[in-house]
Amino acid sequence: MLFDVFQQYPAAMPVLATVGGLIIGSFLNVVIWRYPIMLRQQMAEFHGEMPSVQSKISLALPRSHCPHCQQTIRIRDNIPLLSWLMLKGRCRDCQAKISKRYPLVELLTALAFLLASLVWPESGWALAVMILSAWLIAASVIDLDHQWLPDVFTQGVLWTGLIAAWAQQSPLTLQDAVTGVLVGFIAFYSLRWIAGIVLRKEALGMGDVLLFAALGSWVGPLSLPNVALIASCCGLIYAVITKRGTTTLPFGPCLSLGGIATIYLQALF
């Protein structure tokens, strides 16, 4: 029935996808900020350090607030993208600057959802790619902040890809998706092991290995070299622009871009 509506009103799906992307992007900002804190609290509890009830946070509580003045953000000031523009990037109460990251994450998510709806109209694969985009955006920003890819995001990428293949919404068969995961894991784990011996230091984090393997469920074994090539080029460009030299490079965003780019290249060519 829903697809019948989209057929009758072809502009409806891109509009809904864009609005949905803005809303999901707003939620991703919460996840990006709070999830690492939640894990640190869990680790503290594991070691016997009990945080106070007031300081303990979840994805739902406490309500979003300004990190500078601690004032709870009003509903009218929490509209994705629009509120940041209307407030000119400042807190209504203390006038402290609001990071540009918040509208950028919301805008990027909206654009990712819009693009998927345009490339795969009236398709379950479009929804799957939207979900993938959300996983990758959150994982990439956390990796940029903390140089760490949480397992929950790489597992989300993995299971979403496998479920899409199982439900026959993916261009891949379930067998190809599983093979892609196995080949991706073996290839990148071997590369990690060899690079560790040659360089005598960890060249790839285990999170990078797991993310590459998870992307195999989306692109299949034959397209994994494309993911690695695009990711390597992105990593090189990022290192040159930021002048990081031999310092640790967060590779998750590069792999994410390589995976998404490969999925769209498969669709277009």
Swiss-Prot record:
Main location, first listed in the record: membrane
Subcellular location: Cell inner membrane
DNA repair listed as a keyword: no
Domain of life of the source: Bacteria
Note: Encoded in a type II secretion system (T2SS-beta); this strain encodes 2 T2SS but only this one (beta) is expressed under standard laboratory conditions.
Recorded family membership: Belongs to the peptidase A24 family.
Disruption phenotype: No effect on assembly of T2SS-beta, severely reduced secretion of the labile toxin exported by T2SS-beta.
Membrane topology: Multi-pass membrane protein
Organism lineage string: Bacteria, Pseudomonadati, Pseudomonadota, Gammaproteobacteria, Enterobacterales
Transmembrane segments: 13-33, 102-122, 124-144, 147-167, 178-198, 210-230, 249-269
Descriptive protein name: Type 4 prepilin-like proteins leader peptide-processing enzyme
Annotated function: Cleaves type-4 fimbrial leader sequence and methylates the N-terminal (generally Phe) residue.
Gene3D superfamilies: 1.20.120.1220
